[in-house]
Amino acid sequence: MKRNLLRFGLSLIVLLVSVVTKASEITLTYSLGTITAEGTLPANATVEGGSSYTLPTNTSLYVAGSTLTGWTDGTNTYKPGETITAPSASATLTPVFTANTKSLADRTEATTLTYYFGHKNGAQDINVEKKAGILVTQATVDGESIDVKIDLDATTKGKFNNVDRKDEWAQMNADGIITIPSCKGATIEMAAYGDITKTTIDGQAEYTPGKVISQTIASSAETVNIVIGDGSYYSYLKITLPVVASKPAGKTFNNEAASVVFAMNDINNASANS
């Protein structure tokens, strides 16, 4: 009898703890609100009220001429990547975009843009197949951080996908197109799980084949295309735009250097995206 009562008591305690735990969980819902932006929202998060929660950095939303500088619940505004104390009740977070005062054209020193494709390195879900998408990173120009996007095109062929992966890799199928910022002398670097041999950059494959490749751009075009030739798992894309003086004695620069890096998820779970 005592043993049965003890078991009942323990079961009741477990039930009460479970109820209390579930009652303390809250949902943070991401919404555009009245904002019109290109891209996709971060995934909603279910967390325990009062616990630490880190807001995502912006890798998936873009407004031309502006930068995502915060997430607001209507009362408080938090910076992307900031760790906060989760509220006690569920809340909706909408993005705050601030107009840029600088652009890549204003850079007076080499700028590096790094795009990571995998969740491990901060990317949000990438699921681009039979459609177009974007990936966003930040560049620092004269002390100001600005959003810079690349375009992912798989409308007719190709695929970009890191869904359900927790590593640094994203699957890319042949014929997917990535449009990136560029200038004469820009250096493009990519990393993949397997050797890159057929992928072209601005129509050329002038690199030493390998898991990490690097190619310098000869044209003065402001954007160039990368066409995936080697279906594989990719981790990052890095673009470095050099500074090119427009006048020998002047202080104005056009098409100055900048770098961009794209990263992808772990290959250890490669079967997840087959």
Q: Over which residues does each language-model region extend?
A:
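Sec-dependent, cleavable N-terminal signal peptides
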Residues: 1-25
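Secondary-structure capping and domain/repeat boundary segments
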Residues: 23-102, 251, 270
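Extracellular Ig-like/FN3 beta-sandwich strand-entry sites
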Residues: 88-90, 185, 221-223
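N-terminal targeting leaders for non-cytosolic proteins
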Residues: 102-172, 252-274
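Short beta-strands within extracellular/lumenal beta-sheet-rich domains
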Residues: 160-185, 210-214, 233-236
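A short beta-strand element within beta-rich, extracytoplasmic domains
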Residues: 182-196
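Short, surface-exposed beta-strand/strand-loop-strand elements in extracellular ectodomains
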Residues: 194-207
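Short beta-strand-plus-loop segments that form exposed binding edges in beta-rich domains
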Residues: 226-233
